[in-house]
UniProtKB/Swiss-Prot annotation:
UniProt-recorded name of the protein: Type II methyltransferase M.Bpa9945I
Gene3D superfamilies: DNA Methylase, subunit A, domain 2 (3.90.120.10), Vaccinia Virus protein VP39 (3.40.50.150)
Gene encoding the protein: drmMII
Cell location: Cytoplasm
Family: Belongs to the class I-like SAM-binding methyltransferase superfamily. C5-methyltransferase family.
Active site residues per record: C136
Function noted in UniProt: Component of antiviral defense system DISARM (defense island system associated with restriction-modification), composed of DrmE, DrmA, DrmB, DrmC and DrmMII. DISARM is probably a multi-gene restriction module, this subunit is a DNA methylase. Expression of DISARM in B.subtilis (strain BEST7003) confers resistance to phages Nf, phi29, phi105, phi3T, SPO1, SPR and SPP1. Protection is over 10(7)-fold against phi3T, 10(4)-10(5)-fold against Nf, phi29, phi105 and SPR, 100-fold against SPO1 and 10-fold against SPP1.
GO molecular function term, any single one: DNA binding
GO annotation (BP), single: negative regulation of gene expression via chromosomal CpG island methylation
A Pfam family recorded for this sequence: DNA_methylase
Domain SAM-dependent MTase C5-type: 1-444
Domain of life of the native organism: Bacteria
Free-text disruption phenotype from the record: Cannot be deleted in a DISARM-containing strain of B.subtilis.
């Protein structure tokens, strides 16, 4: 089945689809480093298919500086020259928009041409599925209080017009994308109504879940075996004449013997103090650690892997270190520290209400809470549970919570890595979505 992946980010959604035999002909993403991450992931999938993961591991060993990423890749291209064209054709580092107002943008007409070139390269004559959708940050509930004045004029709101144009052009059987719950409630539900009506005009039905009552279609990924509380909406659209049903994710959920906790997810990763570790260098696994000491989840994350990258603990200010210790002590007693409970000398914000939950620990014995892109700005909402380490999560720890396997390398400077991880659809969830969507499409042959 041929897929186009729009607004790909670091490839979290397409990873699950790739795993279940969908062929992703094109990834469209505006962020440069997210595209480089997707390219590295395509290296991995290509070399795995060639039965040459040794070469991928070699790449992980040598590529320890994002500034000379091209040099690091040279020896892979030397062995497989065809890879260079594959990456060029399948990863489109482009931004949707109007080139008249934004010189960095690509018009929808040009974007359609580029995607057509990608399809030709893949020898695809039609598109079965479009995955990924416009990031409606402007409608995110978290963002809504901060963006009170700008919600109406945020140009990102118009992205779905571009998205619709692509759907209309390639006429896939279906499209699927993940979004924040706010998309259903924005402007008293008018925004979602508008989305449905505008797809109706081009012959598509859009469903937000199995319930007639849209707002009850919010799902928590934790209920599907993903080790994270993450509430999202999965929108599924299809050609009216196909009359599909909404995919049954429940049927494919992951079952663990007991609910996953932070301990199951990150406790095998090396202990780091702030400023220790490496952004890009490969950590090989500690072979003295017996397999019997690893959780089933940790074993799953280590499949096809000799180690992991992106494990650097960011530096921390003295004041924050003190707050983290207090927060971890609270967590030990099963409590979350509230900002107004901090000693006066540690407070820096006058508006205590807005920052009430500013500091949050991923406690050992409970399921991790949602990881979002804000983790690129500071780690206060993602504090490591070990008081000895007294730091925020590394990119790799956040990636574990998001369900990215250890051999998934995030390229670029650390801030870009954190953003990529925080914005991603967890690959474990996208695998569930892929299987359920496949059932729907195949059931209607």
């Amino acid at each position: 089945m041929i897929v186009i992946d729009l607004f790909s980010g670091a490839g979290g959604l397409s990873e699950g689809f790739h795993k279940h035999d969908f062929k992703i002909a094109a990834h469209v993403e505006k962020e440069y480093w997210a595209c480089e991450t997707i390219k590295t992931r395509l290296f991995y999938h290509f070399l795995k298919a060639q039965n040459d993961l040794e070469l991928y591991h070699e790449y992980l060993r040598v590529s320890d500086n994002y500034r000379n990423i091209e040099q690091s890749r040279a020896f892979v291209f030397q062995r497989y020259p065809e890879l260079r064209e594959k990456l060029e054709m399948e990863v489109l580092n482009r931004k949707f928009g109007n080139p008249h107002n934004d010189p960095t943008a690509t018009s929808s007409t040009q974007m359609i041409q580029l995607i057509q070139n990608s399809l030709q390269y893949s020898r695809a004559t039609s598109v079965d599925l479009i995955i990924g959708g416009p990031p409606c940050q402007a409608y995110s509930l978290v963002g809504r209080s901060r963006m009170k004045d700008s919600v109406g004029k945020d140009s990102r709101n118009y992205l779905f017009q571009y998205y619709k144009r692509i759907v209309d052009e390639f006429k896939p059987k279906a499209f699927v994308f993940e979004n924040v719950p706010g998309i259903l409630t924005a402007k008293q539900g008018k925004v979602y109504q508008e989305i449905k009506e505008s797809f109706d005009q081009i012959g598509y039905t859009v469903l937000s879940g199995t319930s007639q009552e849209d707002r009850s279609n919010v799902i928590d990924f934790a209920d599907f075996g993903v080790p994270q509380r993450r509430k999202r909406v999965i929108l599924f659209g299809f050609q009216k004449k196909l009359n599909y049903e909404y995919p049954n994710f429940e049927r494919h959920k992951l079952s663990w013997n007991s609910p996953l906790t932070t301990r199951d997810v990150i406790s095998d990763l090396p202990v780091l103090k702030p400023k220790q570790g490496h952004d890009l260098r490969l950590f090989e696994y500690d072979t003295t650690q017996g397999v019997d000491q690893l959780s089933p989840y940790e074993l799953m994350m280590r499949e096809d892997s000799i180690g992991f990258t992106n494990h650097f603990a960011r530096p921390i200010k003295e004041r924050d270190a003190e707050i983290y210790q207090i927060a971890i002590e609270h967590a030990t007693q099963g409590r979350q520290i509230k900002y107004n409970e901090l000693p006066e000398r540690l407070k820096t914000h006058k508006n205590e209400k807005a920052f009430l939950d500013r500091f949050k620990v991923h406690w050992w014995d409970i399921i991790p809470h949602t990881v979002v892109a804000h983790i690129s700005k500071d780690g206060h909402y993602n504090i490591h549970p070990d008081i000895e380490q007294c730091r925020s999560l590394t990119v790799r720890e956040a990636a574990r919570i998001q369900g990215f396997p250890d051999n998934y390398k995030f390229e670029g400077p650390r801030t870009a890595q954190y953003t990529q991880v925080g914005n991603a659809v967890p690959p474990l969830m996208s695998g569930i979505i892929a299987r359920a969507v496949k059932d729907v499409i195949n059931g209607h042959h």
